[in-house]
């Protein structure tokens, strides 16, 4: 129980604090100073900086102590591991708070998916807050596993762990005043909750209208000019450094003393190998400092700025009364984590976790999510009225695409992969309602010359997507995905040669992040070296985004090939 009298006595040095970090270099995010001294902690609260004695004392030998890092916007599902395993990985990188949008699992499992994520993240040495997914489904051009309306979200909106409404991707719906979109915005407003934005290239009067609807943040800026305009409008900007979308090196050049307090960091979508190799928020801080940002400012963007944006009281700074969420760093250049303290407890030290992540939650309601009609080679037959057709041309080292016209070779009006070198067939198979809906299209530049690959990670509705150079291997891959209940797989010469099961909603594995990263890396190597995939293509990431019908120019869903520019099926 909090006793103010006793805390004051300990702050005065009359009584010993429970924990004192001795000989620290303390990063003060308020004054931009590095302060030498002892840091006194009692329970979960910082009680003072100065000269203190404690029941437990740790000599830090001039190491740096910073506020624990905050990820202001993340989709855990993109790590392909369970929330507990994700927590284990990012705690070791100095992260003590994350703000999660469970958008991916919500598109598969609806409210059951959100509830699973909330249950799974209880009682961990990591604070996990939620933004309720605002766009389920993301569009009407694909079949999702759920539809969430304002009435559905009302069940959880007043939870202490729910900070507001997740990224409002449907900015056209905001501007056109769609009833259901406005209902969700009104719901968040009625509970005084925050609304996250998703508004790439939205500027001028449209941005004014978007902000007027109550939207406070954005993580989609691609230029300094766009970032500054949104800051002028009162928005907080989360600079994103994900696996596919990386904006830090561009945007950080526009950060200065005038705008820095409105800027945060976020991972958004970050894959397991990137977290293990490069890090999490520590990577953002490190890259910011490398790009010339003053070290206390970089740490401020990874801590107090996000805390203030999301109304997290007593979080994000090292000062009396603030929560003792701390990261001990070897230096302020490499930002190497030595120790992590969460709520006054040492939870990670010398590359070892000192507190477990708790027992795993029941996955019954978020497993066995592949529900399809039997798929045969006949189902994947592509009949064309003409030998000139639209093809999805994938870009190298990017998730962007071009809509190109190509002449193809047909056999009795049917596309045959063996007659069209350099062009792969792609199909999206609805996996939620057993509708039998299948969209089929063609892809160039992917480079796959043998076999097929398939996945249940296919943004945003996460149907099965399969790409190959022959129908037999494509069907084999789809059947394997159904057999394991979701995941990613490779087939070749009529045989399955590698599979990673993603038993949680077809999106996440219960295995360790190290296991998942190693398996994904192995499968990528097989794609490049055995199947012939272009080495400038990340096969499974590129495959996953081929199904997202909101990114220009051309995509594929279970309903067909979609022209994003002209907003129509081809």
Curated annotation (Swiss-Prot):
Family annotation (InterPro entries): Adenine_deam, Adenine_deam_C, Amidohydro-rel, Metal-dep_hydrolase_composite, Metal_Hydrolase
Q: Which family does it belong to?
A: Belongs to the metallo-dependent hydrolases superfamily. Adenine deaminase family.
User: Taxonomically, what lineage is the organism?
Assistant: Bacteria, Bacillati, Bacillota, Clostridia, Eubacteriales
Name which cysteines form disulfide bonds. Answer: none
Query: Its gene?
Result: ade
Q: Which UniProt keywords apply?
A: Hydrolase, Manganese
**A Pfam entry, by short name:** Adenine_deam_C
Q: What is this protein called?
A: Adenine deaminase
Cofactor names from the entry are: Mn(2+)
Naturally occurring in which organism (per UniProt): Clostridium acetobutylicum (strain ATCC 824 / DSM 792 / JCM 1419 / IAM 19013 / LMG 5710 / NBRC 13948 / NRRL B-527 / VKM B-1787 / 2291 / W)
Q: Which terms does the UniProt entry file under GO BP?
A: adenine catabolic process
Enzyme type, top EC level: hydrolase
A molecular function annotated in GO for this UniProt entry is: adenine deaminase activity
- EC number assigned by the record: 3.5.4.2
The UniProt catalytic activity note for this protein reads: adenine + H2O + H(+) = hypoxanthine + NH4(+)
């Amino acid at each position: 129980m909090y006793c103010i009298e006793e805390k004051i006595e300990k702050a005065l040095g009359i009584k010993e604090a429970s924990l004192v970090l001795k000989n620290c270099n303390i990063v003060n995010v308020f004054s931009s100073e590095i302060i030498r001294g002892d840091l006194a902690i009692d329970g979960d609260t910082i009680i003072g900086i100065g000269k203190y004695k404690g029941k437990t004392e740790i000599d830090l030998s001039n190491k740096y102590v910073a506020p624990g890092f905050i990820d202001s916007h993340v989709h855990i599902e993109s790590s392909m591991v369970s929330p507990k395993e994700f927590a284990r990985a990012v705690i070791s990188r100095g992260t003590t708070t994350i703000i999660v949008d469970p958008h991916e699992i919500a598109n598969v499992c609806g409210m059951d998916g959100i509830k699973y994520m909330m249950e799974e993240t209880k009682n961990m040495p990591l604070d996990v807050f939620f933004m309720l997914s605002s766009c389920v489904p993301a569009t009407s051009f694909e079949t999702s596993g759920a539809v969430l309306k304002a009435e559905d979200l009302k069940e959880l909106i007043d939870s202490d762990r729910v900070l507001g409404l997740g990224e409002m991707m449907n900015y056209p719906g905001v501007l056109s005043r769609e009833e259901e979109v406005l209902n969700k915005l009104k719901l968040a407003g009625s509970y005084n909750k925050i609304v996250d934005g998703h508004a790439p290239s939205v500027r001028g009067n449209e941005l004014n209208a978007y902000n007027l609807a109550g939207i406070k943040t954005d993580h989609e800026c691609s230029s300094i000019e766009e970032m500054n305009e949104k800051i002028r409008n009162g928005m907080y900007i989360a600079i994103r450094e994900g696996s596919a979308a990386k904006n830090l090196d561009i945007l950080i050049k526009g950060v200065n003393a005038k705008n820095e307090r409105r800027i945060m960091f976020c991972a958004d979508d970050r894959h397991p190998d990137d977290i293990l190799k490069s890090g999490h928020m520590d990577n953002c801080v490190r890259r910011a400092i490398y790009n010339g940002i003053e070290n206390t400012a970089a740490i401020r963007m990874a801590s107090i700025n996000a805390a203030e944006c999301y109304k997290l009281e007593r979080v994000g700074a090292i000062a009396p009364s603030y929560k003792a969420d701390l990261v001990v760093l070897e230096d302020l250049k490499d930002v190497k984590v030595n120790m992590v303290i969460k709520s006054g407890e040492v939870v990670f030290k010398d590359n070892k976790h000192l507190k477990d992540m708790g027992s795993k939650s029941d996955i019954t309601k978020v497993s066995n999510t592949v529900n399809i009609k039997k798929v045969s080679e006949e189902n994947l037959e592509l009949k064309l009225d003409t030998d000139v057709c639209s093809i999805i041309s994938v870009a190298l080292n990017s998730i962007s695409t071009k809509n190109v016209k190509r002449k193809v070779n047909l056999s009795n009006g049917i596309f045959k992969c063996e007659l069209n070198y350099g062009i792969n067939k792609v199909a999206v198979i609805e996996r939620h309602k057993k509708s039998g809906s299948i969209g089929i299209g063609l892809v160039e530049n992917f480079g796959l010359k043998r076999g097929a690959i398939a996945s249940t990670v296919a943004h945003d509705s996460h149907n099965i997507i399969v790409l190959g150079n022959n129908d037999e291997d494509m069907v084999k891959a789809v059947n394997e995905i159904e057999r394991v209940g979701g995941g990613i797989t490779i087939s070749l010469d009529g045989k399955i040669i590698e599979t990673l099961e993603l038993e949680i909603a077809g999106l996440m594995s219960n295995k360790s992040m190290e296991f998942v990263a190693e398996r994904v890396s192995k499968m990528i190597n097989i794609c490049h070296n055995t199947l012939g995939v272009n080495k400038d293509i990340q096969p499974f990431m590129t495959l996953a985004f081929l199904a997202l019908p909101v990114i220009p120019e051309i995509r594929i869903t279970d309903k067909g090939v979609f022209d994003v520019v002209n907003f129509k099926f081809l």
